[in-house]
Amino acid sequence: MKKTVLAAGIALVLSFPSMAAEPSTLTDRADRLDEVVYGSIQNGSFLERIDSLDTEINGSTDEKATEGQGLDTRIDRLYNEVIRSDNDSQPSLDTRVNTLEYYLTDKIKQDPLSSRVDTLDSTVFGKEQTGGLASRVTALEKAVYGDNHYELTTVTLPENTVFKISLNDEVSSKTNQVGDPVHFTVAEDVTVDNVLVLPRGAQGSGVITKVNGPKFFGRSGSLEISFDQVISIDEDTIPTVL
């Protein structure tokens, strides 16, 4: 999937490295799963954490299904199920929740997956449902979409695509230093041939690369920011260039 973007508003050109490099170790993947599902890395042994994730996602830990599976197999399965699916016809849970939120509210939240599904349940059904997140998301899709079926589509994002962003936090030459992270929010939908690539509310990140402090006699300071990447609706990372 080829995507390059130019963001205006604070005008950026996107040509993305990874927002966060794809976790390579088992520990990194488990930590990332915790962060996506719960909002923070959980305490407990590795096995306890994976069992908890399995229960949260699938409603239970099936001992027969996991018998003989090593930690790497279980973590890879959960990672593909929750964060990075290799199957366009069955996107990850995170992508499916992104799509539901966008369909219902025209924006995407950045809260933990568990609380996002709780909110969707309350919005659609009037109260939070029981069971694993996977079955609850399936029920939400059935209620919201009916018999319609949505799949991911590969598109090419034209070079120098322009869109508006807003900074999530105030930055200042008085208080910020070189190397400080900067986070931004996409302020408008970005589509290609009626296919949504970046929804309003999508998150991106960068870093402050240069700071000139305020001068004497009322001369204001300045700073430079490298806007590095933004995340698409399917959790793909798109590089950006200011």
Language model features: what each stretch is:
Residues 11-12:
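Repetitive helical segments and hydrophobic/amphipathic motifs
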Residues 21-142:
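Alpha-helical, heptad-rich or low-complexity scaffold/stalk segments
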Residues 151-242:
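Contiguous beta-sheet cores, especially beta-hairpins with glycine/small-residue-rich turns
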Residues 2-8:
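Sec-dependent signal peptide recognition
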